[in-house]
């Protein structure tokens, strides 16, 4: 009878151990001989990629620090440099622009990173120097150049702390040419940082906030900024120098994700002869990418249930052992049983948590 009760208690512990805790994700250099797909927590990317929608014929201008021209995963249609007199020196020596280009359009070539829109056409405008410094004048030149190239989307993973009339005019000009401008809502530099970032804060720009790996808003400060859509920005795989990849976190990368995703929606709409506007595009992006931002993360519920069930199991085991102790002749077996059971509880929880961690990475 005692053994039967013990089995029932252990079954309860196993059930409790099947729930999860919040995993921890660390940034690192990634090297792989196989293709690496981008984060797709909501399954939104798969619905396009599985139907061979990869951004074909969609032109995306990237205004950043240039591009690594030797990276095997990256290709571009045109490129130009606005940071010096040599317009042909668009080589990225900073790394930021290469990462943005990789997230948006890394090619599907059987190895390395696959971008959000791997068949899109990239137009590179180097508007930030090798130290990452950027001025209004260079961004304005980049915007005007992108308009001349008749691109469909302009990605600006850069930000200014204030607006500029000439910058706004360049943005307005791009919008008037039916170009979708996607820009960062601004990094969170400290707790309580809710300052608006430009050009993302302009009304006609799609301003992007950041989601964590679970599809939740990364920081509450984003709720106080001008954000039109949230996109994944934690632990995104990026292209880097020497054909390496990195895991990176930041709203810059969320912006790139959003630009690539916009290209997928565009291709899908064009294939069905549907019209494209900023509002209709934004509506689809929000429906696809922001499914879970108002809900409670799954690990909150499962972690709570795990704690409650484990607590109840331990209390039940303790009561059972006390009652058995009083009835026992030797008064040793119940204590030994309780000790073994507690050890099993700890072991089961540790194993299940580790398995969930591996699955959740």
Language-model features: where?
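Active-site core segment of subtilase-fold serine proteases
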Residues: 28-121, 141, 214
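C-terminal subdomain of the subtilisin-like protease fold in secreted/lumenal serine endopeptidases
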Residues: 152-156, 165-166, 177, 204-207, ...
């Amino acid at each position: 009878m005692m053994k039967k009760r013990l089995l029932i208690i252990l079954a309860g512990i196993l059930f409790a151990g099947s729930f999860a805790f919040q995993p921890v994700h660390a940034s690192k250099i990634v090297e792989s001989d196989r293709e690496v797909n981008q984060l797709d927590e909501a399954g939104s990317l798969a619905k396009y990629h599985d139907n061979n929608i990869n951004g074909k014929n969609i032109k995306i201008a990237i205004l950043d620090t240039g591009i690594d021209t030797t990276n095997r995963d990256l290709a571009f249609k045109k490129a130009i440099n606005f940071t010096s007199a040599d317009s042909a020196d668009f080589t990225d020596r900073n790394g930021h622009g290469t990462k943005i280009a990789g997230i948006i359009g890394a090619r599907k070539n059987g190895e390395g990173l696959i971008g959000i829109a791997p068949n899109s056409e990239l137009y590179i405008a180097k508007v930030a120097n090798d130290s990452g410094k950027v001025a209004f004048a260079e961004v304005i030149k980049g915007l005007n150049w992108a308009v001349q190239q008749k691109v469909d989307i302009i990605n600006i993973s850069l930000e200014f702390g204030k607006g500029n009339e000439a910058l706004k005019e360049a943005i307005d000009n791009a919008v008037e040419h039916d170009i979708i401008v996607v820009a960062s809502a601004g990094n969170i530099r400290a707790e309580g940082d809710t300052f608006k970032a430009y050009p993302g804060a302009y009304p006609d720009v799609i301003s992007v906030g950041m989601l964590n790996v679970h599809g939740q808003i990364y920081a509450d400060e984003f709720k106080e900024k001008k954000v039109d859509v949230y996109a994944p920005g934690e632990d995104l795989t990026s292209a880097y120098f020497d054909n390496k990849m990195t895991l990176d976190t930041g709203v810059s990368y969320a912006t790139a994700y959003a630009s690539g995703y916009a290209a997928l929606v565009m291709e899908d709409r064009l294939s069905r002869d549907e019209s494209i506007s900023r509002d209709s595009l934004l509506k689809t992006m929000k429906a696809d990418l922001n499914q879970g931002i108002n809900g409670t993360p799954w690990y909150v519920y499962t972690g709570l249930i795990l704690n409650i069930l484990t607590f109840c199991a331990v209390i039940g085991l303790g009561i059972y052992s006390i009652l058995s102790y009083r009835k026992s002749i030797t008064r040793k077996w119940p204590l030994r049983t309780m000790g073994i059971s507690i050890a099993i509880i700890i072991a089961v929880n540790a194993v299940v948590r580790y398995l969930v961690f591996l699955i959740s990475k």
